[in-house]
């Protein structure tokens, strides 16, 4: 079992005490609030659930919660990793809550969700990395709200047996998302507990086991990567047959986290999106405020449509060859 980092290890991997750079105008958002926002907040509190919206200090929380959209975080609020960019607490997690799957299903039902995103902290302390809890949550949501489509955003299950991933694939989430987060060169400082090719291989394994499951991955920009490195990651993702790419600006949560090296301009995000589409991604979301689950439901609908068009194009091409 890997060592669980101490809660202050994020500080030692960043410029401790460095001031947070002032955000440019294109990153400014309205403060959260309003009746719909408070209703979503109240429901999540009532069911005792955590959301990545809060734990990761997402800038889009006001907009998403007002629209009755939230990304549920299972397996507790304490992570066994200490990624330098992440605002989630690090330490020794609590025991897995057996009531959690039912509570997530309650959220899907009470919010009348067409699409739900389920993520988790890393649980290196568990034999299967928490895979069985993902399966129970998927099954509970399907039983309660069969029409709700399900997207999961998973950890890397590094060092866990293959059956951990196998059981999730057999549960057939509609979208399997695992973020590469940054370019390989920056992994030792940004994702010290992870390995780039382990994460890439995870996405590839999902497609090998069930090609019908959509795969998705994302990068944070502004950590010191360069354009060619981002393009290489795109190529690696396409080699792994990833369908959907998300690109967003890294924002430093607190002074103890790794600092922002660059605020990437909206025009640069548009240029990256054009490159990604040219490389063959079925769906690309690329903007300063893009996050993995931002507009996830609408993007999933467009992703299905894009795949259908691609299949029809292939069928027409094959039909022409046989004529």
Swiss-Prot record:
Question: What InterPro entries does this protein map onto?
Answer: Aldolase_TIM, Elp3/MiaA/NifB-like_rSAM, LIAS_N, Lipoyl_synth, rSAM
Q: Identify the residues that bind [4Fe-4S] cluster 1.
A: 53, 58, 64, 293
Entry GO MF terms:
4 iron, 4 sulfur cluster binding; lipoate synthase activity; metal ion binding
Instruction: List the signal peptide residues.
Output: none
**Positions contributing to [4Fe-4S] cluster 2 binding:** 79, 83, 86
- Give cofactor(s), names only: [4Fe-4S] cluster
The main location is cytoplasm
Describe which pathway this protein belongs to, using the record's wording. Protein modification; protein lipoylation via endogenous pathway; protein N(6)-(lipoyl)lysine from octanoyl-[acyl-carrier-protein]: step 2/2
Subcellular location field: Cytoplasm
Reactions that this protein is recorded to catalyse: [[Fe-S] cluster scaffold protein carrying a second [4Fe-4S](2+) cluster] + N(6)-octanoyl-L-lysyl-[protein] + 2 oxidized [2Fe-2S]-[ferredoxin] + 2 S-adenosyl-L-methionine + 4 H(+) = [[Fe-S] cluster scaffold protein] + N(6)-[(R)-dihydrolipoyl]-L-lysyl-[protein] + 4 Fe(3+) + 2 hydrogen sulfide + 2 5'-deoxyadenosine + 2 L-methionine + 2 reduced [2Fe-2S]-[ferredoxin]
Q: Name one Pfam family in it.
A: LIAS_N
PROSITE patterns per the record?
RADICAL_SAM (PS51918)
- Which positions fall inside the Radical SAM core domain? 65-282
Q: What is the protein named?
A: Lipoyl synthase
* Gene that encodes it: lipA
